[in-house]
Amino acid sequence: MTISLARYNFFISLELLKTLVAKGVKYFVLCPGSRSGPLALAAASLSKRKELTLITSIDERSAAFLALGISAASGQVSCVITTSGSAVANLLPAAVEADRSCHPLLFLTADRPLRLKECGANQAVNQQDFLKSVCRHFDESPKEGIHLISKERLTSLVGKSFEMASNIPGPVHINLAYEEPLHPCELDQKKVLDGWVIEGFLKGKITPTKDEVVKSFQSLKLLKLDPFSLGIIIVGPWRGKVKQLNSFRGALKKWQKLTGWPILADPLSGVENDQEGLINHWDLFFSIGLFEKIKEIQVLRLGPIPPSRELQTWLKKPGKFQLLITEGDSRNLDPIGGSTQFSEGFSCWVDKMLEVIPVKPAIDKKIVSKKLIKELIKYDLFIHDWLDKRLFRNGLITEPALARLLPRLLPESIPVMIASSSPIRDWLSYSGEGAFLRRCFGFRGASGIDGTLSMGMGLSIIMGRMVLVTGDLALLHDTNGWLFSKDKNISLIVIMIDNGGGGIFNQLNIDRIEEGDFEDIFLMPQQVCHLTLAKAYGLKYKQVACLDDLEKAIEWSFSLSTNVLIRVCTNSIEDHRLRVNLSDDLKKTLSENLSSFD
């Protein structure tokens, strides 16, 4: 009796997924397709047996960002399964973000066999090359068909791919050719599930492997800073592994206690509010020129640089001895070009530094930095009170006021995802200590608006009840993300800032446009009612008109367990004027009330 090739395809697909599960992959996001049918059947079988968690999505781009959110929150490899053709192209935006943000992500894509390539066959494209430029690793099955793969090759393929996704976390692509027939009959499925094995395919026990990988960089010479001299710490978005974040925080506490250096942290840095030396409104310090009198200083930069233009301008000026430390990522992460990079991680660097620092000198080792941090804290407290009075005095909702008030209205245990463009920049400038009361997530790898809602949904699968702050265009760009609302494990409060399009472009330095309309070519407002759209997806929603309404809407949203939408309308032109006026008025007020530091 001849055994159908479909049974072989199903068997190998099942073995492949079992091997991934044994490695520790728990979450699989499945997109529809015929060529990927054997993988779909295998995933469904393992899901029914509670061996993996299966989530389905009709949109490959949305699916990839959902998986990205799962990986970002858990620190574990998540997997996306797609069919062939343009389906694979839709994975690129999430792959780009996973690469730059260092999140472990695995793409399993079904493909046509070699005989159908380069001959005009339908849906046969060079998909094996679509993601290579941003992936940590690419591998594939035998081009003639996955049914020809051996046990040893399968184990090697999965093992290497998992290691490359986990080592310096990032995206990995495995392309799998499937020869027809693709779909096993019920008898073939039952035979495989009951233990049938391809003759000669050694079915050994698959054992989980510990996360022990060899570092991809060579041991570097210890790059030193003088803890007894003037210095400052700049902490960018967290790019290490989730499980390493606590040791990073511990190392930061050690180094700050030793040096007394002030800390300027990005909202996505993972730094917590109880960190000594944390300066909450540092971005405004740069915008009003408070750092201009500091001519020479050591700068310890941890991770990518925050997106403050004023900070970057200051760092480019002479007199800054800069050391950049990354969490295992040896790629150049210095767009300024003024630093020396150490890639073995901050905890490692601090431990090595503590071994070589001389005995504590007789004088107070913090005396040099004491004056600086004392002055910064004085300014920080003044700005804190000043912003509260300016932003809350009339009860109107503005984007800066929203960034300042929202963190105070949310329980401290509630994580927040902050979308790109205006929201993340306003949190950087105006949220104050609120950004450090909880874990914040966002797109700071490629800073796009692709997949904003879907990533928020993925984060919620791991984090539970959480909040997404997004603009109207970013939300509209990914409305298919609402389709995940059927998943009972997702509980997302979406606060949408509706400013009539791409409000951030009002901040461009364009006096006027010779030909064309600024609104048409930059803002691009859309004639869409988001509340009606929410209703179409079966969501509960609220409209907010003032700051008092916001507090009531937040209380209402937390009384529910489902996904909800809160719409907040703002005026992007007026908010741009407000930001400029805040900077100008603050500079004037400080010059009248406080003495500047040297």
Curated annotation (Swiss-Prot):
Pathway: Quinol/quinone metabolism; 1,4-dihydroxy-2-naphthoate biosynthesis; 1,4-dihydroxy-2-naphthoate from chorismate: step 2/7; Cofactor biosynthesis; phylloquinone biosynthesis. Belongs to the TPP enzyme family. MenD subfamily. It comes from the Bacteria. Its cofactor is Mg(2+); Mn(2+); thiamine diphosphate. Binds 1 thiamine pyrophosphate per subunit. Catalyzes the thiamine diphosphate-dependent decarboxylation of 2-oxoglutarate and the subsequent addition of the resulting succinic semialdehyde-thiamine pyrophosphate anion to isochorismate to yield 2-succinyl-5-enolpyruvyl-6-hydroxy-3-cyclohexene-1-carboxylate (SEPHCHC). It catalyses: isochorismate + 2-oxoglutarate + H(+) = 5-enolpyruvoyl-6-hydroxy-2-succinyl-cyclohex-3-ene-1-carboxylate + CO2. GO terms for biological process: menaquinone biosynthetic process; phylloquinone biosynthetic process. Keywords: Magnesium, Manganese, Metal-binding, Thiamine pyrophosphate, Transferase. The keyword ATP-binding does not apply. Homodimer. Its EC number is 2.2.1.9. PANTHER family: 2-SUCCINYL-5-ENOLPYRUVYL-6-HYDROXY-3-CYCLOHEXENE-1-CARBOXYLATE SYNTHASE, PROTEIN PHYLLO, CHLOROPLASTIC. This is 2-succinyl-5-enolpyruvyl-6-hydroxy-3-cyclohexene-1-carboxylate synthase. It holds the Pfam family TPP_enzyme_N. GO terms for molecular function: 2-succinyl-5-enolpyruvyl-6-hydroxy-3-cyclohexene-1-carboxylic-acid synthase activity; magnesium ion binding; manganese ion binding; thiamine pyrophosphate binding. SUPFAM superfamilies: Thiamin diphosphate-binding fold (THDP-binding). CDD domains: TPP_PYR_MenD, TPP_SHCHC_synthase. HAMAP family: MenD.
